[in-house]
């Protein structure tokens, strides 16, 4: 039996965090290519530091003649992404930073296996769901995201003009009988523009927004608040710390509450099972919990490069289900085609829906009308039940 009484901590980072900025650039490039060619193959990495962005990786297009045309748009895509995030600092400005593009054509040896509908690489992928929030996500990561998303809204609307784009949050939640009941500590480090602002000044700005998104009963007189605990946080973003695509994989997923296969998501087209199979695993786990078959569920999938069918499917419900895990494994494998092509088609992944995933979590988001976050739907519930 899993522990019922404990304190668990998760962190999130804002869209202006250097690593998240790079994730968004990588996914903006991916979206631009998928918008023109749904069969585009993309593996795009970005690196950002003071005044500079470097983009590299591999792309493959159905019409190779258009490769040069797309290459000419990369710098503009990167600048627009940086502008949207809000970087207009002296040493990192969307309009003046140097953008170096080293993207090149994808290896034919990689593409040949994928062209036969096999997986784009070997690997293991995990999906997770738990009934402690309406989104069926772990509460610490879900609310750590919510804090930063709300503060970004306030900054971008002009309501809080002294806040900068770079920020991090961290929540420690105390659980009783397996349910979150109290925030024991709350950490927020938020970039600001005025060097004269103190930690107390920043807390006065951010606290109303934090209280707006958190359940009121979780904040008690015992909750420790740590807002900009080091003091001044004016130098931020890539000018303060270099950023790199794919370095926030725990922030992107479940905040450490579930295993991670190690593969990052951003910049990868959906033939890459690092991304698409992780989305499918979340979809399956969420539908198992939504079906009432378990209060908590993790699903693992594994693949080999060039091989279509998953090598293994594993489920664990942590003692919260009356249905044997082996039966759940069989049911989910029958309810959905888990080949890479089957996943792409079932979740309609070959479209420009990825930049929005690159900040504030890939999971626990509301499905969009245009097909974004399709893996958050609970439309597989009846199919899974029929297979049991």
Curated annotation (Swiss-Prot):
**What molecular functions are annotated in GO for this chain?**
ATP binding; magnesium ion binding; methionine adenosyltransferase activity
Organism ancestry: Bacteria, Pseudomonadati, Pseudomonadota, Alphaproteobacteria, Rhodobacterales
Keywords (A to Z) from UniProt: ATP-binding, Cytoplasm, Magnesium, Metal-binding, Nucleotide-binding, One-carbon metabolism, Potassium, Transferase
Chief place of localization: cytoplasm
Could you identify this protein by its name? Answer: S-adenosylmethionine synthase
Give the Pfam families listed for this entry: S-AdoMet_synt_C, S-AdoMet_synt_M, S-AdoMet_synt_N
Which pathway does the UniProt entry assign to this protein? Answer: Amino-acid biosynthesis; S-adenosyl-L-methionine biosynthesis; S-adenosyl-L-methionine from L-methionine: step 1/1
Query: Where does the chain bind K(+)?
Result: 45
Q: Which organism is it from?
A: Paracoccus denitrificans (strain Pd 1222)
Cofactor stoichiometry and binding remark: Binds 2 divalent ions per subunit. Binds 1 potassium ion per subunit.
Q: What does the sequence similarity comment in the record state about its family?
A: Belongs to the AdoMet synthase family.
User: Which PANTHER family does the record match to this protein?
Assistant: S-ADENOSYLMETHIONINE SYNTHETASE
- InterPro entries according to UniProt: ADOMET_SYNTHASE_CS (IPR022631), S-AdoMet_synt_C (IPR022630), S-AdoMet_synt_central (IPR022629), S-AdoMet_synt_N (IPR022628), S-AdoMet_synthetase (IPR002133), S-AdoMet_synthetase_sfam (IPR022636)
Q: Which residues bind L-methionine?
A: 58, 106, 241, 272
What the entry lists under CDD domains is as follows: S-AdoMet_synt (cd18079)
Question: Which gene name does the record give?
Answer: metK
Task: Name the segments for region: Flexible loop.
Answer: 106-116
| Catalytic activity, reaction form | L-methionine + ATP + H2O = S-adenosyl-L-methionine + phosphate + diphosphate
Enzyme Commission number(s) of this protein: 2.5.1.6
Question: The organism sits in which domain of life?
Answer: Bacteria
Query: Subunit info?
Result: Homotetramer; dimer of dimers.
What function is annotated for this protein?
Catalyzes the formation of S-adenosylmethionine (AdoMet) from methionine and ATP. The overall synthetic reaction is composed of two sequential steps, AdoMet formation and the subsequent tripolyphosphate hydrolysis which occurs prior to release of AdoMet from the enzyme.
